[in-house]
Structures are given as C-alpha cells and as structure tokens.
Regions:
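Extreme N-terminal starter segment of soluble prokaryotic enzymes
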Residues: 1-4
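Active-site metal-binding loops of divalent metal-dependent hydrolases
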Residues: 7-9, 28
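Conserved N-terminal subdomain of the carbohydrate kinase-like
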Residues: 12-19, 23, 41-118
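Short catalytic helix/loop segments, enriched in acidic residues and glycine
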Residues: 19-34
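Alpha-helix C-terminal capping segments
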Residues: 33-42
Length: 119
C-alpha cells in the first residue's frame, strides 16, 4: 500500500527533565514517513526545507525507501524550526520558539508520480 504524508520536515530543539538538544531533525512528516517505511514499500512525502537541511537526512529518507520527489528545497532560505520544553510528566510542554521560515510560503505540490497512492 502506498501512502502520502504531507507536513513538516523540520529542526527541533527539545528540553526535558532528562536532557536537552539544540538542533535535531524533527517534524511530523519526517517521522510518519520513517515509521511507514518499516511497514510500507514506498512512503511518499510532501514537505519543504531550506538549504540548511542536511543532505545526509535526505539520503537517509531515500535509503529507507521514502520517495522524496515531493520534498521542495528552497535555496537561500531556512528550514522550519520549533523549540519546546517538556514538563516532568512528559505529557505537557511549552513552546519556546517557532520560526516558520520556508513553511510560511509553503505551497504543497503533489507530483504526478504520487497519483496512484492509496492513502
């Protein structure tokens, strides 16, 4: 079954009572696609990143069988960034910073090759 995921491929900075990261790859579309790759022959993603997004991560997507034809890379722009702090229970969090960057003008384009996807 072929699926399409539309959403964020981003950078996150996360603080918990147990540790802190400054800039890691995040975003719903990232983790939906990576998770689906374990059960699906060909997840397809639609998102946008800036020129600061690591080529190694795009290569990882491809290595895992994720179709990245719908991933727009905007030269001269920065990737969406979110920063948050999770509380002791890990169920609640506060957003510390949101920088829309490329997401502000994102116009999702569905490639023709995605037209036969089931979901």
């Amino acid at each position: 079954m072929k699926i399409v995921s539309v959403g964020t491929v981003a950078f996150d900075a996360i603080e918990t009572p147990f540790g802190k990261t400054d800039k890691i790859v995040g975003g719903a579309c990232t983790y939906i696609s990576l998770s689906a790759a374990y059960f699906n022959n060909s997840p397809h993603l639609i998102s946008v990143v800036g020129e600061d997004f690591p080529n190694e991560t795009i290569a990882l997507f491809k290595d895992r069988g994720i179709n990245t034809e719908g991933l727009q890379i905007k030269n001269g722009e920065k990737t969406f960034f979110w920063s948050g702090k999770y509380h002791q229970d890990m169920n609640t969090r506060d957003t510390l910073d949101t920088q829309l960057n490329v997401l502000e003008s994102f116009d999702p384009i569905v490639p023709n090759s995605y037209q036969d996807c089931d979901i």
